Amino acid sequence: MKRGLFVGRFQPVHKGHIKALEFVFDQVDEVIIGIGSAQASHTLKNPFTTGERMEMLIRALDESGLSKKKRYYLIPLPDINFNAIWVPYVESMVPKFEVVFTGNSLVAQLFRERGYKVVVQPMFKKDILSATEIRRRMIEGEPWEDLVPKSVAEYIKEIRGVERIRMLATNLESSEKELQAPIRIPEY
């Protein structure tokens, strides 16, 4: 049995991720999907929580039919910001795997140095199928829904994700004092 690893931040999950995962699912028996920057949320670069990203992946994989095709695992991978030991860290966090799928040259290099087979999966419409571009469109009020699976667009609306991203993008001068005030727990 051959198991592959695919790591992404999925902020949010988009059609390019699903196209890449279709390629990955065709190459191996089981797929480990590592959710990078798992500790990060509520920032412009990482607006969604790990749980929200997992929900997006589950819904998108169900919608695409991939969830019925192969067994997959969703594994949160918090950042360690230490490239030289990142691969052993990932190895300690996920089940055993034989091949890594990536479009990131640093990730490819780090895994090759540790002796892994690395497959550079095709990138699909990278200019527009990019989470950065999707978040930009959300902020600017431009159409973004066609760039993500329908189930993901619906979920982002359910959790008011666009409103969150717009809030994170605003200056918030009028609310600055309120946001900087310490949270006080009422005494009873």
From Swiss-Prot:
One of its GO terms (molecular function) is nicotinamide-nucleotide adenylyltransferase activity. It is an enzyme of class 2 (transferase). Signal peptide: none annotated. Keywords: ATP-binding, Cytoplasm, NAD, Nucleotide-binding, Nucleotidyltransferase, Pyridine nucleotide biosynthesis, Transferase. It catalyses: beta-nicotinamide D-ribonucleotide + ATP + H(+) = diphosphate + NAD(+). One of its GO terms (cellular component) is cytoplasm. It is found in: Cytoplasm. Its EC number is 2.7.7.1. PANTHER family: BIFUNCTIONAL NMN ADENYLYLTRANSFERASE_NUDIX HYDROLASE, PHOSPHOPANTETHEINE ADENYLYLTRANSFERASE. Belongs to the archaeal NMN adenylyltransferase family. This is Nicotinamide-nucleotide adenylyltransferase. It comes from Pyrococcus furiosus (strain ATCC 43587 / DSM 3638 / JCM 8422 / Vc1). The lineage of its organism: Archaea, Methanobacteriati, Methanobacteriota, Thermococci, Thermococcales.
